[in-house]
């Protein structure tokens, strides 16, 4: 969905260009000021699933008069990139008619964002010029018969490279949180969990405290609340305090840095891994509250900005992000850089503590690279697992692949979602056989790309209902084979060894065994 925001623009002030281009947007919202805009963005982002107003499946434009609000277009765009990194949103000064040509790009931009394969392709491979704001004003193309700055259009759609470069730029700026954001009471966007707490005060703490935790059953508001509840407790235990509103701003910014439209690698997965990390820490790091806090924070940030694909796809097509990290642990380095920048801005005290401890958070995130799995398996079997750097790596690795250790009813739902994401990777590879990954998204070859079904209805069913594993297999009969492969290749030996070293974790290997037995009964012939 795409939105045109008209900020402080009265009907009489609308130019003919605005009126003529309103139909490119799914909705037009008139707001009094930029404060109201910030509230609208946050409220939309935490709407219930399926959230059509996530600002990722369409392009949104903010029209306003900078002179009225003492905030330039550039400053507002920087604010968007800083606090809403995954959003396809940009600002335009509506008082300058030549700027309004930008509206004519929206139809083509929306076609890229609404097709999940062209959207992911753009995220991963789109090339940018080197101008500070990502816009080459000398590059023009034709859209709807008019000459428009195509690079300016393309720069409005999220890419991994833009996310990374904007994050680095923010690190250099070291700007304070602007008033527009600072004055927001973030608790006001969490009405659903607050209402539930009023009825049952310990509700979220109870679900966080069990291995049967199911992040799939929670709304975005509830996921943020779970993160808030757990981190607040851990920070108090570690005596590394942060004000409630600052912690909520960090969590809202982090959620907006993940892609809601991803099936598996999203904020839901981040909360799931953080909860699993904490539960493992209660067994393995009982007397170290600072390390527990650091490791749980690494867990919630370990996949930030994840495109829902893999390192191999980035390497094979020689993406600029892959080249940036010399084809080594590409996504893990990408997540690490983004998350450390977020912490440097929102919780610098914690980042400082992390760096004093052999760059604790950085090492933990890099340990999640599955290409290194066998190395950590060897460490588990042949080294002292209580060695600090080995232990933190083992904990976050176990948490990252903990889906196969959850109860079967939960594990099967995660299996379904990762299968959908793998299917997207296969579709992306097929797409590359007909299109160069980095080619101009506004070229003619993009016009007739088939749009694959978004699977929203089936995903909603998985999230809302406790779906029986048998029903999942009926619709996706090859899931058992995929789960058996993953368990045999990565999980079984790892969790068996972990359980042998730490007897309190035997329930993990027991659950893997139970789940594998179920999948084996439903295995399809090769």
From Swiss-Prot:
Note: Present with 6510 molecules/cell in log phase SD medium.
Residue positions binding a divalent metal cation 1: 269, 302-303, 400
Pfam short name (any one): PDEase_I
Signal peptide residue numbers: none
Top-rank taxon: Eukaryota
Assembly: Monomer.
Taxonomic source organism: Saccharomyces cerevisiae (strain ATCC 204508 / S288c)
Active site residues per record: 265
Domain PDEase: 182-526
Gene Ontology CC terms, in alphabetical order: cytoplasm; nucleus
Function (record text): Controls the level of cAMP in yeast cells, together with the low-affinity cAMP phosphodiesterase (PDE1).
Gene name per UniProt: PDE2
Family affiliation: Belongs to the cyclic nucleotide phosphodiesterase family.
GO process terms (BP): adenylate cyclase-activating G protein-coupled receptor signaling pathway; cAMP-mediated signaling
Top enzyme category: hydrolase
UniProt remark on cofactor binding: Binds 2 divalent metal cations per subunit. Site 1 may preferentially bind zinc ions, while site 2 has a preference for magnesium and/or manganese ions.
Cofactor: a divalent metal cation
Example GO molecular function: metal ion binding
Keyword Metal-binding: yes
Enzyme Commission (EC) number: 3.1.4.53
Keywords: cAMP, Hydrolase, Metal-binding
Entry binding sites for a divalent metal cation 2: 303
Protein name (Swiss-Prot/TrEMBL): 3',5'-cyclic-nucleotide phosphodiesterase 2
Catalytic activity: 3',5'-cyclic AMP + H2O = AMP + H(+)
């Amino acid at each position: 969905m795409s939105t045109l925001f008209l900020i402080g623009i009265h009907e009489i002030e609308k130019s003919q260009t605005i009126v003529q281009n309103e139909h490119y947007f799914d909705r037009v919202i008139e707001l009094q000021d930029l404060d109201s805009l910030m509230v609208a963005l946050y409220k939309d982002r935490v709407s219930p699933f399926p959230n059509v107003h996530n600002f990722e499946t369409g392009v949104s434009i903010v029209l306003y008069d900078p002179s009225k609000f003492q905030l330039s277009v550039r400053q507002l765009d920087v604010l968007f990139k800083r606090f809403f990194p995954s959003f396809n949103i940009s600002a335009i000064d509506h008082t300058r008619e030549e700027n309004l040509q930008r509206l004519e790009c929206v139809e083509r931009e929306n076609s890229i964002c609404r097709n999940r394969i062209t959207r992911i392709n753009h995220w991963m491979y789109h090339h940018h010029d080197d101008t500070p704001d990502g816009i080459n004003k000398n590059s023009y193309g034709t859209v709807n018969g008019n000459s428009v700055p195509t690079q300016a259009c393309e720069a409005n759609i999220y890419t991994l490279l833009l996310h990374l470069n904007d994050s680095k730029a923010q690190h250099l700026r070291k700007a304070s949180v602007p008033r527009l954001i600072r004055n927001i009471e973030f608790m006001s966007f969490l009405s659903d969990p607050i209402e539930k707490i009023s009825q049952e005060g310990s509700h979220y703490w109870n679900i966080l405290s069990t291995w049967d935790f199911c992040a799939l059953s929670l709304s975005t508001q509830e996921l943020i609340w779970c993160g808030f509840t757990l981190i607040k407790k851990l920070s108090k235990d570690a005596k590394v305090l942060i004000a409630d509103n600052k912690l909520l701003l960090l969590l809202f910014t982090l959620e907006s840095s993940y892609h809601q439209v991803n099936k598996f690698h999203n904020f839901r997965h981040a909360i799931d891994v953080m909860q699993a990390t904490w539960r493992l820490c209660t067994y393995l790091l009982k007397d170290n509250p600072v390390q527990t806090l650091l490791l749980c924070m690494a867990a919630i940030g370990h996949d930030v900005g994840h495109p829902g694909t893999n390192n191999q796809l980035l390497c094979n097509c020689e993406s600029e992000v892959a080249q940036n990290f010399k084809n080594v642990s590409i996504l893990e380095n990408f997540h690490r850089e983004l998350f450390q920048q977020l912490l440097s801005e929102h919780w610098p005290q914690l980042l400082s503590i992390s760096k004093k401890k052999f760059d604790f958070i950085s090492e933990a995130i890099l340990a999640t690279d599955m290409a290194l799995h066998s190395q950590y398996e060897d460490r588990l079997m042949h080294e002292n697992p209580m060695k600090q750097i080995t232990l933190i790596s083992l904990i976050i690795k176990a948490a990252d692949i903990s889906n196969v250790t959850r109860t079967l009813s939960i594990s099967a739902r995660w299996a379904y979602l990762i299968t959908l994401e793998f299917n997207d990777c296969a579709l992306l590879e097929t797409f590359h056989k007909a299109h160069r990954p980095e080619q101009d998204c506004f070229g003619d070859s993009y016009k007739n790309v088939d749009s694959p079904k978004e699977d929203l209805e089936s995903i909603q069913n998985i999230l809302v209902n406790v779906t029986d594993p048998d029903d999942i297999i009926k619709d996706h009969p090859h899931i058992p084979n995929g789960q058996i492969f993953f368990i045999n290749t990565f999980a079984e030996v790892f969790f068996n060894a972990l359980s042998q070293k730490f007897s309190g974790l035997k329930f993990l290997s027991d659950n893997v065994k139970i789940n594998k037995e179920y999948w084996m009964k439903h295995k399809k012939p090769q």
